[in-house]
Amino acid sequence: MFKFLKKLSTFLIVLIGILLVGGITAAGYFAFENREPINNYYKEGYNKVKQYNEEIKKVSKSLSSNELVKTLGDVESSIKEGKELTKLLGDSALESSFNQLEDSLSKVNNFSKGSTFTEVKNTIEKINQYVDEILKRFPNPNENDQFKEYVTNISQIVFYVGVSIIGTFVVSGALLFIFTKRVYGVRVSRFNPQRLLKKHLVLLLQKNQDVYDEVFES
């Protein structure tokens, strides 16, 4: 049972190693063959993030220039003029509507001048700065092909490393098979075994003549 578990664990380790190295090699090959689409996806994502950040900058600029307060002031003036007209017309219902609108506008105006509005502006500016820093850390695909070169170089390195590992295993296995042979569970050289190894093998195998002949005479 112990021998079976030992062989099973060895087999699983070898299998996992083969799958891992094979997966790394395949990933490198796939990335190299598809470096153009990968670069296009990166470029598209980069430009979208940049576009969104520009839109946020426009909002931040509008808030910083206090366009909202200016617009609210214009609306407030129009409401006052409307109230004066309703007084001349004597329409109390319309005047009441203007009063409600003026009250709502005053609340918005107070918000735009308050600390909450300032916090909103500061938060938007922080978002702009953060996104700008992120974009600076990544290659700009609109200016150069640096990202494409990264993908090409890294994929080639990964592929060749995987191929080298696989090749090492194959060559080692071939050399082991060519220069050695397994006899009764013991791997010995196919060419000119040393006398000391011969002596110890005979003692170890309890001077079994059949085994001796198999190892040294065949």
UniProtKB/Swiss-Prot annotation:
Keywords on record: Cell membrane, Membrane, Transmembrane, Transmembrane helix
Which InterPro entries would you find in this protein's record? MG279/MG280
TM spans, by residue? 11-31, 159-179
GO CC: one term? Answer: plasma membrane
* Membrane topology value: Multi-pass membrane protein
Task: Write out the annotated subcellular location.
Answer: Cell membrane
In Swiss-Prot or TrEMBL terms, this protein is called Uncharacterized protein MG279 homolog
Give the organism's phylogenetic lineage. Bacteria, Bacillati, Mycoplasmatota, Mycoplasmoidales, Mycoplasmoidaceae
